[in-house]
Amino acid sequence: MSKDINIVSRGTKQVGQRLLPWIFPIVLLVVWQIASSSGLLENRILPAPTAVVSAFWHLLISGELWQHVKVSAGRALLGLFIGGGLGLLLGLLNGSSRFASTLLDTTLQMIRNIPALALIPLVILWFGIDETAKLFLVAVGVFFPIYINTYHGIHSVDPQLIEMGKSYGLSRWQLYKEIILPGAMPSILVGLRFALGLVWVLLIVAETISAQAGIGYMTMNAREFLQTDVVLVGILLYALLGKLADVLAQLLERYLLRWHAGYQK
């Protein structure tokens, strides 16, 4: 009997833990709906949640929404692949080589202090207003979180483990595969999660550069016609896509770090 009670108690606790993060958003939506229905909020300023859902549904069934999401997701993934890939490679290089770090790290840190958004006028002069400009902004923005975390992840590996690996006769590649990369992986994945959140922020601005498709274009176009409900749909889409990217990064983190004590149940 007591065993059954414990099972039910654990199940109730797990359900409660899953529902807890959604309590505040649900309460916020209810208050928002009440304020809109009672006239405290003008629809021109902040439409009711039901109006936003209606706008979302119309965009969905028309196929327009999927087109914009597909374009934005493609830009985000390609920018992340380019910027993140370069950040990972240079982070591994500078983290492993004192000569490369001395040669390159100071320059990269100086560039890091330049806000990516401040580069917009120069990017337009360089690349015009086509896709290259948008991808460049996203790639530059996501480069540094992955570079810095990879660089510091390599440096945080216990030197005694590396020496032990050398004493066992491991080659340089084996040291990387068995000791250095696994030791740096937690830090690298933190950089990836940060970059996945940042990519959508950068994309919002990048898609205002004379885009013809994408969530940013949809939002800016709706602003021109005072369609506040569509603007909110675009904002919420960025939030949902960012959350989805973070969840996928967490799943990847659990898979790659399944050997780590902190990720074992």
PLM regions and their residue ranges:
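C-terminal transmembrane helix and the adjacent membrane-cytosol boundary/short C-terminal tail
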Residues: 98, 186-190, 232-265
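Transmembrane alpha-helical segments of polytopic membrane transport and secretion proteins
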Residues: 1-24, 247-265
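Short helix-to-coil transition segments within interhelical loops
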Residues: 154-160, 164-184, 224
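Transmembrane alpha-helices
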Residues: 136, 140, 173-205, 229, ...
